[in-house]
Amino acid sequence: MDVLNAPPTPAVSVSPQRDYAIFMQVVRYPPISDVAQPMLRLAGIRIDTNTNGMHMAPYYISYAVKRLADGDDVKVAFPQDAKMGPPVWSSDGKRFAFTNTTPHGMELWMATTATGQTRRFDGVVVNGVLTSGGGRGGPSSIEWMADNRTMIVRLVPAGRGAAPLLPAIPAGPHVQESLGHAGPAPTYEDLLGTPHDEDLFDYYATAQLAYLDTSTGKTTPLGTPGIYTLVRPSPDEKHLLTGRLHHPYSYQLPAGSFPQEIQVWDRSAKAEYTIASLPLADRVPIAGVRTGPRSYDWITRKAATLTWVEALDGGNPLEKVPYRDRILSHAAPFQGEPVEAAKVKERFAGMQTLDNGKALVEDYDRASRIVRTLEIDLDKPGSEARVIFSRNERDAYRDPGSAVTKTLATGRRAVIQTGDEILLSGAGSSPTGDRPFVDRFNLATGKGERVFQSEAGGYEAIEAVLDDSGTRLLTRRESPVETPNYFIRNGAELKQLTHFANPVPQTAGVKKQLVNYKRADGVPLSFTLYLPAGYKAGTRLPALLWAYPYEFSDADTAGQVTGHESQSFTQLNYHQLGVLQGYALMDNVSMPIVGDPDTVNNTYVEQLRMDAQAAIDKAVEMGVVDRDRVGVFGHSYGAFMTANLLAHTTLFRAGVAESGAYNRTLTPFGFQSERRTFWQAGDVYTKMSPFWFADKIKTPILMIHGEADDNTGTFPIQSERMYAAIRGNGGTVRLVMLPSEAHGYRGKETMEHVLYEEMNWFDKYLKP
């Protein structure tokens, strides 16, 4: 259990000036008492009623602040028993704010970077519903203004009173209806179901925006209370881009689909311009987008120019159109009509503005899985987009990386650019594993120059680029025998910044290697093989096979190696701990399903069988695995895989399926990458569903599921009904339901019990 609960390497956040870093320690598995806190499940959101924040929002228990120039520590007085959100830096990097979650609410704190002095803002209670921590570019409870003194915060409204009580007598029946218009939707969880649910959602999600003067601690209300999805100052800070949900709500869709008003305000909350009054998005095509404006933002390097995207195909990816989306812009004072800046042939997937009026735009073709990076000129409406990169989304070897950004004085993130050159940073996937890199790339010539790449045999991840040339980096270095630590790299020169001790000396001697092979039809595959410490060559061990299937358009991309498991430090995740109990572990086993994206699942079972057969054959050929003592296990779609392998093969002696979906007729509008509905491809849904073959599962299977699963499609009833089907047909099966746990298990006691259950199961059926 010591290895299971060993602390992970701290995460890092670098200041906007790139001169300080905060190393943030997370608890790998918090206590079950955290997981079991009271919550409401409303509109697809899990709300902690004690804190008025997100239930089980990630938190840090400590920060360590370092000056990057000399590595000196800055002592900071943080709250006792802290549960801190991520730091939110002022644009000058002299201060950072953070929330601290207490049993009674979310506090707001601020620290001075150079001195470590901290203060709590008394009387400020943050509303953490509909937010994701902090930082510009995403929903946040905290937004710094460029004066580095003022913040916009979302507060629990003062004097709002107690939460609405469930009426003792129902007001009437709960009614839903649809009047003949198609509206397919995934099987979302945690939706609204009654008028009382609506009242509770309004109560907890409603926030009061306010300006907070960090010098005095005084708050000034901004506008009226509302359910805000967005508040973002313009670069010149004369305007605020806001989004606000309103009724009528849906009982079939989560909050992100509710009606929404997108407006520009002045600094006093007076509406200046309405971008869109979006209706309920209840008729969005499968894999489509809602019509009307979306992806709205400010253009980073302009004073106050809006940009947003609109679909030209009705949001339907099946429509044949010359252009699928258009990008519009509108400058203050927002008079006249918006300008159509550019059109893209495929679905818009993101934009980063450059410093010359141009922008990098990504679009994605659903039919071919091709993702492109385009250069467009926002200052020349109607000009043709120029293709910079184009590749299959699964083609990791050709991934050019992402543009590196830095923080401007306005607090906005912008692409680092010197003339025509930008910096790109990526995973660097290769046949030997990931080798992260930084490139200097010329947009005019299309030529790149490699500035840095992680050496083979180890793993050096790029955590931050510390200068505009890309030569000074903050990296995290590790190897199978080297504990992860942070370094400052300046070209070839390395300076160690942290000295974290080995948290898991128990893993010393565990061997691991990347293994490459092919399946029967020639598709290249791989897995990472773990062998116990002291393993003697030629000894055949009982083995555990852990995998998760993915879909690919072609064999070349299906066979690519991704990840850095074989080069990284051997800390071991929970599913890998069998190697400490005498098992060989075949980890991250390739399970590709290859074919046309529209019909790839027609041969799902056949390909899955070939994948598993090839992996076992290779391990047996190497002389390390006993063919007659192999177990298979996986989580979510990996659990689905496990049940299918036990239903359709005799390759395994036992299986463990965590939080799976086994009857695909209960996810009738598509699942994973399946694009067809049940009514279009009922035979495929049936053939892929192990529930329909429960009578064939005679290999012992342990099924585990969180009672509060929140993942689309994997309702707990999937495991409950699968257990009943196998039991009813005379199979050997055990069902373990985990109280309070969601799709991904979090609680310390939960993880210890899961490990106990799985090791006992495999020991019983795989060991002599």
Predicted regions and their residues:
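Secondary-structure transition/capping motifs at alpha-helix termini
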Residues: 265-270, 333-335, 365-368, 376-383, ...
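Short beta-strand element of the alpha/beta-hydrolase
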Residues: 531, 539-550
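Conserved hydrophobic/aromatic pocket- or pore-lining residues that grip, position, or stack substrates
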Residues: 3, 262, 306, 388, ...
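Beta-propeller folds
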Residues: 1-494, 499-510, 524, 559-560
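N-terminal cap/lid segment of alpha/beta-hydrolase-fold proteins
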Residues: 498-539
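Active-site-proximal cap/loop segments of hydrolase catalytic domains
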Residues: 57-63, 68, 563-768
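Active-site glycine-rich loops that stabilize anionic/oxyanionic intermediates
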Residues: 548-553, 562
